[in-house]
């Protein structure tokens, strides 16, 4: 790969905190899907919040640790299967044509203008990888890497724990690259550089980001302008949801009355189940009755959240 035309910033010996600070300065491959709305883990709002330092660093989860630890295994497994050779780069790559972006790639191919992305995932995700040309969830990331590196193709190897090993090839498509990089540049110039947030969407990850950024409420009032139509729509939708929830409960109860003690029922092409499930819970009242001298309060975990409500004043 012709990486000599690009700027390299070595990541050898770099701490995780240093690496996180560096990746926040530009758009990376893992940000691409969120920017264009193809990720369930990120949105334009959350990427903006991350790049502008409003969100804390993500906790290093067990899944993330496994992904790093098994990256070398996935690469070796891919080489065994394909007969191709790869090597580490250990650097952030920057292309002067795209100053708003960087690439931190897993492996470079030896003797080929290409790269390799290594992934590990749960067996629950196996259906996403069977019988597909290229997994959608990793498509934007690999297009981003081809844009920054100038590679002609990008390979993807996915280890699904206990279920299979999948390999894919994505050929360079300049039109796709141009479209993605235009979207990334527009995102960077429109939102990150002027520190202007994108309009929040309705996803859970955006809701979590807002709750994190504005975790501590202040006892003050602000005047909202131009939101009256939206709030009126909100009130209508809440009423509609209440009516729909009521009808859903009514249908459920009618069917339960039909099934009685039976746990299974069929009707046309519908299969219905109403199964008995057990749930264990801790009885604080019984515990203190049996062990009155033990104080459990030091072990209670207090969580805080802000509750959103809209009250429509009657005129």
Language-model regions, residue ranges each:
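Accessory terminal regions of nucleic-acid processing enzymes
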Residues: 1-315
């Amino acid at each position: 790969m012709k990486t000599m035309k690009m700027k390299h910033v070595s990541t050898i010996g770099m701490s995780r905190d240093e690496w996180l600070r560096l990746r926040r300065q530009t758009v990376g491959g893992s940000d691409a899907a969120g920017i264009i709305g193809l990720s369930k883990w990120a949105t334009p709002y959350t990427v903006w919040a991350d790049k502008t330092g409003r969100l804390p660093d993500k906790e290093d989860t067990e899944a993330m640790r496994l992904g790093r630890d098994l990256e070398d295994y996935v690469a070796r497994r891919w080489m065994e299967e394909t007969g191709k050779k790869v090597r580490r780069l250990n650097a952030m790559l920057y292309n002067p044509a795209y100053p708003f972006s960087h690439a931190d790639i897993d492996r470079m191919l030896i003797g080929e203008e290409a790269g390799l992305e290594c992934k590990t995932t749960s067996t629950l995700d196996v259906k996403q990888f069977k019988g597909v040309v290229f997994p959608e969830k990793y498509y934007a990331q690999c297009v981003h890497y081809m844009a920054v590196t100038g590679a002609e193709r990008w390979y993807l190897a996915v280890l699904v724990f206990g279920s299979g090993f999948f390999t894919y090839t994505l050929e360079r498509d300049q039109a796709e690259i141009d479209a993605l990089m235009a979207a990334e540049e527009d995102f960077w110039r429109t939102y990150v550089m002027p520190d202007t947030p994108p309009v929040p969407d309705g996803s859970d990850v955006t809701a979590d980001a807002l709750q994190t950024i504005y975790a501590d409420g202040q006892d003050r009032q602000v005047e909202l302008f131009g939101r009256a139509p939206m709030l009126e729509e909100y009130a209508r939708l809440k009423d509609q949801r209440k009516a729909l929830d009521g009808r859903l409960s009514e249908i459920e109860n009618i069917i339960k009355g039909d099934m009685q003690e039976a746990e299974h029922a069929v009707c046309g092409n519908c299969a219905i189940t109403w199964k008995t499930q057990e749930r264990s819970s801790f009885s604080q009242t019984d515990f203190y009755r049996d062990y009155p001298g033990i104080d459990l309060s030091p072990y209670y975990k207090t969580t805080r959240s802000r509750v959103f409500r809209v009250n429509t004043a009657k005129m």
